[in-house]
Regions:
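Conserved N-terminal phosphate-binding loop of PLP-dependent enzymes in the Aspartate aminotransferase
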Residues: 1-318
Length: 318
């Protein structure tokens, strides 16, 4: 295993180790994996290549042109597209989030695993966001598909700076043939936080509680949308539920956040469920959301806004 202090670093380390383990250096990826050169180089071919992978509008200034045609994005759940990419671009590494808002369909993850086995491609799962939220490991365990390397962060240290790269011994051993180092990777706070977090995860059965509350939140959204006849699309895992308004999404989302803040609730259409969400929190949240949905159903929300309509989610603004 290797440890870093941030997810971007961990992703870059995983790519380095994987490339050291294969003759085929090109990467096919799906999802958001940080700011490093290997990832942003995908936009050299087209500035819109990364737009469908969480964060849009990313410039590649400062990325060497010779990295062009080394990293290629593919759409989630589109196995046919991925298969063609593998054939045409001599892919040696597949890097992806197991899932974010949309669940895998038509046995997608198993198909990816199978083609990796067949073509001798290294499969890396980025579990920085999903790890330890669905179980005491990665969400890939729920789908019974194992990667060659996996990356964990965020919940790993309960907010403290620590990320981990783990994987098959044969591949991880290749890290000895390249140079991977940082002065601050040796600090001890993150490691202690991770070990303490594991103890609390086990003692409090954290993932069971947050999944239970996440399902309650999804039901709240469903019930209120039906009550007020507001069409919404509910997605995501139980631990990280998300919904979108099918009409005037950004305007309604802005109003929702505005009204929640008035009641001292920090909330939007996405919830990272945590252990401290309790019945009283959910009761207050439901009461405010009921009022918000009622006002949205009446229309003219724009007149009730106290600020500009928010940007597209995760859209680059600097």
């Amino acid at each position: 295993s290797k440890f870093t202090r941030s997810g971007g670093e961990a992703n870059a380390v995983a790519i380095r180790i994987a490339r050291a383990s294969t003759e085929k250096k090109n990467v096919a990826f799906c999802g958001y994996h940080g700011w490093h050169d290997w990832y942003l180089s995908a936009n050299i071919n087209s500035k819109k290549n990364l737009d469908q992978h969480l964060m849009s509008g990313l410039n590649y200034d400062g990325i060497p042109q010779n990295l062009k045609n080394t990293s290629f994005p593919f759409p989630y759940n589109d196995f046919k597209y991925l298969s063609k990419l593998i054939s045409k671009k001599n892919i040696g590494i597949i890097k992806m989030e197991v899932m974010r808002s949309i669940k895998p369909q038509d046995n997608f993850l198993q198909k990816v695993r199978n083609i990796c086995n067949k073509k001798k491609i290294i499969l890396i799962f980025d579990e920085c966001t999903t790890g330890y939220r669905e179980n005491m490991g990665g969400i890939h365990l729920n789908f019974k598909v194992n990667p060659d390397l996996a990356i964990f962060g965020k919940a790993l240290g309960s907010g403290f700076a620590i990320n981990a790269i783990i994987g098959k011994r044969k591949i991880m051993k290749k890290a000895e043939n390249t140079f991977i180092s940082s002065t601050f990777w040796g600090e001890r706070v993150g490691y202690v936080a991770a070990l303490s977090s594991f103890k609390e995860f086990e003692r409090l059965k954290v993932f069971k509680k947050i999944n239970k509350n996440g399902k309650i939140i999804k039901n709240i959204w469903s019930d209120l949308s039906k009550k007020h006849k507001i069409p919404i699309n509910i997605m995501g895992t139980s631990a990280i539920p998300i919904f979108e308004f099918l009409n005037n999404h950004l305007q309604n989302k802005t109003y929702l956040t505005q009204e929640m803040l008035k009641e001292k609730i920090l909330a939007t259409n996405l919830v990272y469920v945590n252990i401290f969400h309790n019945k009283n929190n959910l009761k207050k949240y439901t009461k405010v959301l009921d009022r918000v949905f009622n006002n949205i159903s009446r229309g003219n929300i724009k007149k009730l806004l106290n600020s500009k309509i928010c940007f597209k989610p995760i859209n680059r603004i600097n």
